[in-house]
Amino acid sequence: MHLKRIEVEGYRASANSPIVCELPGRFSLILGANGSGKTTINEAIALAHPRSFPRLAPIDATALGPTPRMVHVTYEFEADTLYEGALGAYLKRRGLSAPQWCRPLERSLGRVRAGQPLKSSDEYDSIRLVHLPALRNPVDDLSRRDARILLELLRADERKHPETGGLRSLRAQAEGMLNSLTSHPLVGNVEDRIAENLRIISGGVQEHHAFVGTQTVDDTYLARVFEMLVALFPDRATARRLQVSSLGYVNLLHIAVTLAGIPDAGSTPVPDDLPVDCKEADEGAESAPVAGDDELAKAARERLARTAEAADADADSFYPELFHATVLIEEPEAHLHPQLQYGLIRNLRSLVKERPDIQVIMTTHSADLAAACDPEELVVVRKDTDNHTISRLLADLPLSKSLKTQLFQQTRLHLDATRSAALFADRLLIVEGVTEASILRLFGRAWAGSDTRRVGFIDSLAILPVGHKVGQWPLRLLATSGHELVTRIAAVADTDLHDKPLSDAQPPAWHEELNHESARFFWSHPTLEPSLVSGNEALVKDAFTECNLKAPAPVTTETVDQYFVTHPRNKGRFALALALLIDQNLSSITVPTHISDMFAWLYDGSEPDSTPIDDVT
């Protein structure tokens, strides 16, 4: 069972239009740029769950929009019963549906309050949300005055290893240690001095007596006296407090302790009725010796005491006997090296496979986290052209099964940290190689000129070199009509028609399936380098000289094309030298028409002018 769908309206980014986010399964990564709506989804999940730990910090009521204001969540059973958790199996066994409920969002003393769920408590009583917000403080949670997260870890281990005596044994040991402190001579001397003064002061009315005692040893006390330490070596003596430890490793420790504190809910459903064999029970009762009334009363009192203690422990514990845990982690990449980010994702994915009662949802800005995931686990949150937040599940790509399988295979192969950055982009440029990316960004700066808004656009533009000729991947992944993950995506590709005019170019048939409003090709004829020559002949000639190469005479589009047809190995050296010269002469270069049109369309959707115009800056 897992959280499948979140719908929120009248709150933050959903104030103008509802936000619907669907999740692929028990592991999912929600990614998107700043301001796309991820925080709205995160807080909607937290507000929707009545049973959450730790408590969500108060949210200012200005986050509320016009009515209606509510959040609706829907859980779903696993498609394969082999991967169903204990709670899901129990509900299915009783013929019940997966939980779903709705909560209104209300104002309360200037804060946002989630109202009473509009469903029976049976729907959500066994669902637990563990929320690690972006503004979490691991040092406070693990080592300060109220480290309750450690207490949940102790309770989880008590369930797993009851033979240790659990928290009851730990409290007894702590109480014995504290009581021994009061017998110390120093404490006795202080106690006598205070008691004498109090007797003198209070003797005129009613004499009182003072004693130095210790705190009541309960679970709250245990939460205060424990703290986590971190060491580089497996030696307790070398452990250091978290305040002086690496922030990245403290963040990892926080996640590790939180997950370890989730007890095992079991792998089999809890039976509806306890399997008691009455006959065997009667026979056992007959064979037992008859106890006296006093012994029976004493045994009954002990049972009642144990039952009351167990009830108190259950009330204090966050997790019931049968539950499903939804773990929401915001920005787990905080302070983490990319290698640690990759390992974290792999570990969490393994955890979800091993423990069917846990679902992990993460939100991130990290391309490294996205690269470590399977494409079908990714959810992209973005703004559409109307500034409404939309959520796209990659697994729902509306393509044929064979084509989608092919695209996902290529995505798994190519989705490294560099390419996964494309999933965060609003506008994206696709090129074949890294040299094209470098040259085109420089031409973009020349195109922008002194326009500060255009300069900012070029500097932040995501340029993705795919390392091969631009094909269906990644355009069909990012810009399939009706399922766009970007606002606009442009591809600069070569026609490779060395002896034919540009009008003879025949793009593949699949180009027609792209939405012309969101995806376009711009052609370099016949390749990028020759298409840059017109108006930049002197610069191109200087680039040949910088590479110690003999420039063709004269330098024209045709001669440069023929040169690289016969000397393809010199292309890389030439491109690097040309990029350096462009960077040094931005004010005097000519931007080719197809490149100028490409940047203008990416920038604001402007259509090319009826007559070609080269931007000379």
Residue map of PLM features:
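H-loop/switch region of ABC-family ATPase nucleotide-binding domains
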Residues: 363-365
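Pre-Walker A-like glycine/lysine-rich segment at the N-terminus of P-loop NTPase domains
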Residues: 1-47, 63
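Acidic, divalent-metal-binding catalytic cores of TOPRIM
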Residues: 38, 383-617
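Walker B catalytic acidic pair
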Residues: 330-332
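Pre-Walker A adenine-sensing motif
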Residues: 9-20, 313-317, 414-417
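Electropositive, glycine-dotted interaction segments
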Residues: 72, 78-176, 188, 192, ...
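Conserved P-loop NTP-binding catalytic core
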Residues: 42-91
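Extended helical coiled-coil dimerization/tether regions that scaffold
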Residues: 141-144, 153-327
